[in-house]
Amino acid sequence: MSRYRGPRFKKIRRLGALPGLTSKRPSPGSDLRNQSRSGKRSQYRIRLEEKQKLRFHYGLTERQLLRYVRIAGKAKGSTGQVLLQLLEMRLDNILFRLGMASTIPGARQLVNHRHILVNGRIVDIPSYRCKPQDIITTRDEQRSRALIQKSIDSSPHEEVPKHLTLYPFQYKALVNKIIDSQWIGLKINELLVVEYYSRQT
């Protein structure tokens, strides 16, 4: 299944706010999750919607998300928590959380177009997994810096999560540590996502 490129407002009406996909928010009363035709949602549908929230927020294909679930399942600790940490430490997501891009698709474009360096080297893989002490900078070119500055200026000025430090005047950021669960950028029940995939096998 390919990455979603359809109408974004349709998805947030169905699933609720997805800040990684779009800065828009569903208007009060427009949330279709509470307007199921059958009245009460089935447990399967609840798990499916949580999985879809995760997938659309982080801009993943079905295959990519399944791969992350499998990696998390083999790691020590809670599978759901490890899954969220893996997704949050992706380069495209970190650029979004820093305010260097207004959405994760926008951050992905910055990376794909080679505007971003990690530890002094150009990285053009949006899924690159950032590590503590990684230094993220923009290319020393006017266009690269102009794109970043535009995003920083237009960002809603939300607090940068504690695992990151942004130096906006230097177009630079530091990854301090692996993200803690309370700083995850999405309201999600990750256990339902893990349950969804465990019931598919």
Curated annotation (Swiss-Prot):
GO MF: rRNA binding; structural constituent of ribosome
Transmembrane segments: none
Record PANTHER family: 30S 40S RIBOSOMAL PROTEIN, SMALL RIBOSOMAL SUBUNIT PROTEIN US4M
Subunit: Part of the 30S ribosomal subunit. Contacts protein S5. The interaction surface between S4 and S5 is involved in control of translational fidelity.
Role description: One of the primary rRNA binding proteins, it binds directly to 16S rRNA where it nucleates assembly of the body of the 30S subunit.
CDD domains: S4 (cd00165)
Statement: the UniProt record of this protein carries the keyword Chloroplast: yes
Organism field: Ceratophyllum demersum
Domain S4 RNA-binding: 89-150
Keywords of this entry: Chloroplast, Plastid, Ribonucleoprotein, Ribosomal protein, RNA-binding, rRNA-binding
Disordered: annotated segments: 15-43
Domain of life assignment: Eukaryota
Example of a GO biological process term: translation
Coiled-coil segments on the chain, per record: none
Location(s) in or outside the cell: Plastid, Chloroplast
UniProt family annotation: Belongs to the universal ribosomal protein uS4 family.
Protein name: Small ribosomal subunit protein uS4c
Database matches in InterPro entries: Ribosomal_uS4 (IPR022801), Ribosomal_uS4_bac-type (IPR005709), Ribosomal_uS4_CS (IPR018079), Ribosomal_uS4_N (IPR001912), S4_RNA-bd (IPR002942), S4_RNA-bd_sf (IPR036986)
Pfam families: Ribosomal_S4 (PF00163), S4 (PF01479)
GO cellular component, one term: chloroplast
